[in-house]
A protein has these predicted regions:
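Long intrinsically disordered, low-complexity, acidic S/T/P-rich regions
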Residues: 1-202
Length: 202
C-alpha cells in the first residue's frame, strides 16, 4: 500500500530540540553546532538520493526487459492496457503521497478547518481508485501467469512494488532537502541579523 511507504527519520542526526532558533541564540559555538547537525542531515539525505538514482537506473532496465517480454507474449491491446494501468498507478501514487503530507500538516497544527475534511474525502476517493487499479493489476497478473510463467509474474510484482516505493521515497527526499535548505536560511538570517559583519556559508 502507498500509505505504508517508508518515512525518513533523521532524529538521531538532527534533534529538533537542538534547533530552537530564537534571537536569544547569540553564541557562535551554538550556531556552529546547529549548522553541523543540519549539514550532517543534508549529507545523509543526499546520499540517500544518490542511492535512489542508482536504483532507478536499474529499475529502468528492468522495466525495459519486462515490456519487451510483454510485447513478445501479449497483444498490442493488452500491452496498451498495461501501460495505462502503470500510468494510472504512478499518478495515484503521487496524489496519495501529496494528500498524506497535507493531512499530516493539518493534524500537526490541530486544524479543524473544513479543508481537513475535504482532504480526507479526497484521500478516501484516491484510496478507492488505488484499490481498483490494484485489482486490475491482479487480474493482469493472473493473465500473465497463464500466458508467460509464474517467475515472470514475481519479477513483475516486485517491479511494481519498487516503483511505488521509489516514487514516494523520491518525493520524501526532495521535501526533506527543501526543509534542510530552509533551516540553513533561518540560521543565516538570525545570525546576520545580530552579526551583520559576519556571514555563514552553506
Amino acid at each position: 500500500m502507498i500509505m505504508d511507504c517508508d518515512r525518513i527519520d533523521l532524529a538521531e542526526e538532527f534533534s529538533t530540540k537542538d534547533f530552537l532558533l530564537s534571537e536569544d541564540i547569540m553564541y557562535e559555538g551554538d550556531k556552529v553546532k546547529i549548522l553541523q547537525k543540519v549539514k550532517s542531515q543534508r549529507q545523509q539525505v543526499e546520499e540517500a538520493m544518490t542511492k535512489l538514482k542508482d536504483e532507478e537506473s536499474v529499475q529502468n532496465f528492468t522495466q525495459y526487459d519486462i515490456e519487451r517480454q510483454l510485447m513478445d507474449n501479449i497483444t498490442e491491446k493488452q500491452f496498451s492496457k498495461y501501460k495505462k494501468l502503470l500510468n494510472k498507478l504512478e499518478t495515484i501514487t503521487h496524489l496519495i503521497f501529496s494528500l498524506s503530507v497535507r493531512i499530516n500538516e493539518k493534524k500537526i497544527f490541530n486544524s479543524k478547518h473544513q479543508g481537513l475534511v475535504m482532504l480526507k474525502y479526497q484521500m478516501n476517493n484516491a484510496k478507492e481508485v488505488l484499490m481498483e487499479i490494484e485489482k486490475n493489476l491482479e487480474q493482469f497478473l493472473l493473465f500473465l501467469s497463464s500466458n508467460i510463467n509464474p517467475k515472470f509474474c514475481d519479477t513483475f510484482t516486485n517491479f511494481i512494488n519498487r516503483k511505488k516505493h521509489n516514487i514516494c521515497l523520491r518525493r520524501a527526499l526532495v521535501r526533506e532537502l527543501y526543509f534542510i535548505h530552509l533551516k540553513f536560511d533561518i540560521v543565516n538570517l538570525l545570525w546576520t541579523k545580530k552579526n551583520p559583519e559576519k556571514i555563514l556559508l552553506k
